[in-house]
Each structure stands twice: as structure tokens, then as C-alpha cells.
């Protein structure tokens, strides 16, 4: 992390399974076991996804979401369900377009062994919301609101089974507890963090008829403290 950048440029990248480039900004995903955990990190929960929508990428229709003691990780199935894909975050664009049989074969070869992988570290998470399904209008799709280097970034996923208010309450407990463990001063946000950690926070009604959980404390102080903790346990 540099003095100039405390938050991510983007929320994911398309790479080969097992790639370990820029580990603070992007997760490493193993083809068989899923995300590679960092030293001291524990896996808490995972579920299958039926839809993944991230700015800068085509919508993906299968993957998994993982929650650990440090981050929320999203990974697609092997990246072979579309003919076009892109990536954000300073690693350049990856484009595969197929118009003929030959170009389709070349594109397929380029996609082989690749996966979309992204994570939201808890120190970047502004909040999250349950949104109404576009067809049934029932609550279920999950939107993560993430502080990015250039502003707020949204990632939206749909789970199988659906995400619930009980699950969101649990996620609030995990994120708030991790944030408070950093030992920084959250000022007026301290009380709400305590409510989230205790599971007693009442979510807000959103403008589209969903429910929202705002997590106070995202900022320079929190990001630096979390990065120092990560570097202490992860860097050689």
C-alpha cells in the first residue's frame, strides 16, 4: 500500500487459478479448494452464487461467495461462460472476442484455467443491502457498498439459496467485530458498531424497498490500521 492509495481501484480481476499477484488488492483462488487463506485468517461461511455483477465485467451466472475473518471473497466458476470479459485494477484489459470457428478456439484457449476473483476487505466495506429481486420482488440479491480509490463501488450477487435478513445481521456482527478489534477511535460511529456487533442493529429501509446495513468507520485511520495488521501477519 502506498501513501497515495488506501482503497482499491477495482473489485476483481480475471487471472489464472493460483495467481498470487497483488495479494492485498486481489485474492488468490485455487481451482479445487477456493480462496487461498492468508496466515491467521479463518474461513467462516460460503455459498453458491447464481449471479455476479461487478463494474467493468460481464455479468457472471455462477460462482461462490466466501466470508472469512477478514474479507468477503467472490469467485466465478472457471471463466468459460462468455466470449467477452474485462478486468479492472491496473492489470490491463483482457478481451476475447470470437466471430469464426478459429477465433472461438483461440478465445477458448485463452480462457482456459482462468477465473474472476475479487474481494472486499472489511476495512473497505461501507455497508451492504438486501435488494428486491428484479422478477419476484422478494428480498434476496445482496449489494456490497465498497469504498474505492475513485469513489463508491457496488458489487451485487444473488445466492442459491437467497440471502436473508438473518444472514445480513450475522455479516454485520462479523464485520463490526473485526473493525472494532483494530483499536481505533470511531467517534459517533462507535455506538452503531456495537449494535452491529451485538446483532441488535435495525436495518434501514432503502429507496428501492430493500434493507440496508451501514457500517461506520471506513476511512484513512481504519484502512491504515488494517493494512498494518495484514502486513504484520502476511509479509515475509
Label for each model-derived stretch:
Residues 14-16, 22, 44, 102, ...:
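Intrinsically disordered, low-complexity, compositionally biased regions/tails
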Residues 14-16, 34-36, 157-160, 220:
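Alpha-helical interaction segments
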Residues 2-9, 73-236:
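Acidic, Ser/Thr- and proline-rich intrinsically disordered linker/docking segments
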Amino acid at each position: 500500500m502506498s501513501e497515495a492509495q488506501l482503497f482499491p481501484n477495482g473489485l476483481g480481476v480475471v487471472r489464472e487459478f493460483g495467481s498470487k499477484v497483488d495479494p492485498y488488492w486481489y485474492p488468490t483462488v485455487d481451482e479445487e479448494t477456493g480462496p487461498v487463506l492468508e496466515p491467521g485468517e479463518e474461513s467462516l461461511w460460503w455459498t453458491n452464487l447464481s449471479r455476479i455483477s461487478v463494474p467493468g465485467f460481464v455479468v457472471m451466472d455462477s460462482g461462490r461467495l466466501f466470508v472469512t475473518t477478514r474479507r468477503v471473497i467472490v469467485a466465478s466458476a472457471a471463466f468459460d461462460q462468455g466470449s467477452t470479459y474485462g478486468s479492472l485494477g491496473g492489470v490491463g484489459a483482457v478481451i476475447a472476442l470470437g466471430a469464426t470457428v478459429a477465433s472461438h478456439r483461440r478465445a477458448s484457449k485463452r480462457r482456459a484455467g482462468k477465473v474472476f476473483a475479487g474481494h472486499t476487505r472489511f476495512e473497505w466495506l461501507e455497508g451492504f443491502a438486501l435488494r428486491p429481486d428484479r422478477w419476484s420482488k422478494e428480498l434476496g440479491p445482496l449489494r456490497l457498498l465498497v469504498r474505492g480509490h475513485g469513489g463508491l463501488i457496488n458489487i451485487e450477487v444473488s445466492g442459491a439459496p437467497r440471502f436473508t435478513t438473518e444472514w445480513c445481521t450475522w455479516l454485520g456482527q462479523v464485520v463490526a467485530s473485526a473493525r472494532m478489534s483494530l483499536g481505533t477511535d470511531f467517534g459517533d460511529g462507535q455506538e452503531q458498531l456495537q449494535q452491529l456487533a451485538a446483532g441488535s442493529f435495525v436495518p434501514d429501509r432503502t429507496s428501492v424497498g430493500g434493507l440496508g446495513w451501514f457500517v461506520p468507520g471506513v476511512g484513512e485511520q481504519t484502512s491504515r490500521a488494517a493494512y498494518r495488521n495484514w502486513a504484520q501477519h502476511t509479509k515475509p
